[in-house]
A protein has these predicted regions:
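Transmembrane helix-loop junctions in multi-pass membrane proteins
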Residues: 47-60, 109-118, 165-169
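Hydrophobic alpha-helical transmembrane segments and adjacent short intramembrane/lumenal linkers
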Residues: 81-165
C-alpha cells in the first residue's frame, strides 16, 4: 500500500470497510500510514457533521462532527491501550493502536445514506458495521485472538457508554 495520494486512501478505505484483517494489521505496523488514517477519521467526521447539519441546521455541524470523531478516536485508543497494554500486558505502542482504530471509522461514511434517505435500518446496519470494524481493529492493534479482542471491545464499549450516560444525565 503506497503512503500517499488518493489511490492509497481509496485502497485503505476499501480494505477498512471490507473488514480486511490484513489492512488493519498493515496500518498498525506502519507509522507512515498515519496521515491516511487521519484522513479516514476526518472524512467520517465530515459525514457525521453533514448528518448533524441536516438535523440542527448549518451552525457548526461539520466542526462538531470532526471534533467528535477525533475525540472518540482519542478516548477509544486510550481505553484500548489501558485495557490491552497496561492491564492485559499485550506489547503494543500507542500509535499501533490509534491507526487501526482510526480506519475502523470508515463505515461511518455510510451514515450519510441513512440521513439522506431517512431509512433507519441503514443507521442500524452502519452501527453494527462500526462495531465489527472496531473488533477487527482491536485484534490487529493488540495482535491478539478473537476472544481477547471481543473482551477488550466490550469493555471499551461499556466504559464509553457509562461515560456518555454520566455526562449527559441531569
Amino acid at each position: 500500500m503506497p503512503d500517499a495520494g488518493p489511490g492509497a486512501l481509496i485502497d485503505l478505505f476499501v480494505g477498512a470497510i471490507k473488514l480486511d484483517r490484513e489492512t488493519y494489521r498493515r496500518v498498525a505496523g506502519r507509522p507512515e500510514s498515519t496521515r491516511l488514517c487521519i484522513a479516514i477519521v476526518l472524512l467520517s467526521g465530515l459525514a457525521h457533521g453533514a448528518v448533524l447539519t441536516m438535523r440542527w441546521g448549518p451552525a457548526g455541524g461539520p466542526i462538531v462532527g470532526i471534533a467528535s470523531a477525533f475525540a472518540s478516536l482519542g478516548l477509544s485508543s486510550l481505553l484500548v491501550w489501558l485495557i490491552g497494554v497496561v492491564l492485559l500486558r499485550y506489547p503494543s505502542g500507542f500509535g499501533s493502536i490509534v491507526r487501526p482504530l482510526a480506519i475502523a471509522a470508515a463505515p461511518a461514511l455510510f451514515n450519510l445514506v441513512g440521513a439522506l434517505t431517512l431509512v433507519r435500518p441503514v443507521v442500524l446496519v452502519v452501527s453494527a458495521w462500526l462495531l465489527a470494524a472496531f473488533l477487527v481493529a482491536v485484534r490487529a492493534a493488540l495482535d491478539c485472538g478473537r476472544l481477547v479482542a471481543l473482551g477488550v471491545t466490550l469493555a471499551t464499549w461499556a466504559v464509553e457508554l457509562s461515560m456518555y450516560y454520566y455526562a449527559l444525565r441531569d
